[in-house]
Swiss-Prot record:
Catalytic activity: sn-glycerol 3-phosphate + NAD(+) = dihydroxyacetone phosphate + NADH + H(+); sn-glycerol 3-phosphate + NADP(+) = dihydroxyacetone phosphate + NADPH + H(+)
Native source species: Staphylococcus aureus (strain MRSA252)
Residue numbers binding sn-glycerol 3-phosphate: K106, G137, S139, K192, D245, S255, R256, N257
Gene (name only): gpsA
An example Gene Ontology biological process: glycerol-3-phosphate biosynthetic process
Protein name stated in the entry: Glycerol-3-phosphate dehydrogenase [NAD(P)+]
Function of the molecule: Catalyzes the reduction of the glycolytic intermediate dihydroxyacetone phosphate (DHAP) to sn-glycerol 3-phosphate (G3P), the key precursor for phospholipid synthesis.
Any Gene Ontology CC annotation: cytosol
Broad class of the protein's primary localization: cytoplasm
Domain of life the protein comes from: Bacteria
Family classification: Belongs to the NAD-dependent glycerol-3-phosphate dehydrogenase family.
EC number in record: 1.1.1.94
Amino acid sequence: MTKITVFGMGSFGTALANVLAENGHDVLMWGKNQEAVDELNTCHTNKKYLKYAKLDVNIIATSDMTKAIQYADIYLMALPTKAMREVATQINDKLTSKKTFIHVAKGIENGTFKRVSEMIEDSISPEYNAGIGVLSGPSHAEEVVVKQPTTVAASSKDKNVSKLTQDLFMNDYLRVYTNDDLVGVELGGALKNIIAVASGIVAGIGYGDNAKAALMTRGLAEISRLGEKLGADPMTFLGLGGIGDLIVTCTSTHSRNFTLGYKLGQGESMDQALSEMNMVVEGIYTTKSVYHLAKEKNVDMPITNALYRVLFENISVKECVKDLMERDKKSE
């Protein structure tokens, strides 16, 4: 069986580590928190992120970066976007042979506006890079870890990496499709987090199904506009990495982006909401990146613009909704 190192011990990395172990692979997880490492090795749990899940007993964990790097030739990069470049650079400094990188992050880097695969490519020397791919789609960790039927997409510039990802993860409860549009799959996963925060706000305010449906539909329209401008296939946004991920993230309290938005809609400040959640909310960082990227590319993204004002300019959520509804008349 294949050896795989999972970098990151959050909810999704843990759920996917469990999938890999149940598929018969040898899995080592790396994390900085020694208490979490000890808990996983001793109790086979990760209660901070997956409170009630009992994990495969064959999963092992370490906080030793060198051990994690040497363990396998395939790395699952299950880290927040803002941590990806730093950890990838640390990995690169210790590499002595080629590795394959599969990431599950859903964000756009602040400042550079780069997708996660581009961040990894920047950080890993070509002589050590055997290929980079992404696994993305509608997939709450809480459901994956209890074997609820889930379907996702694997994508890479290298079809062999996409096929490898499919082979590693697919089983009777996790179905994996390959997709050749790496740009589209990564953008779909990242951009839907913006709409998910906005969707949570709408729910928190107490608006009805009409508003929620309009938000997701018009959100998908602006995702597609930016995606096409950046070289994605518009059809990708009608698939698992696009509308599939959008629906699941915009309608569920499992989604930390939706949950943040809901708390904001209920009148909480962002600092208060984040302190209660104690988790990384990718949508905040993605909103900041995409707001500036859309302006640079001259792409109209009114929902993103409105959310940016709420998150970073202290504009009230109801004022932003009013502004969206009173925009100039347009054709769909």
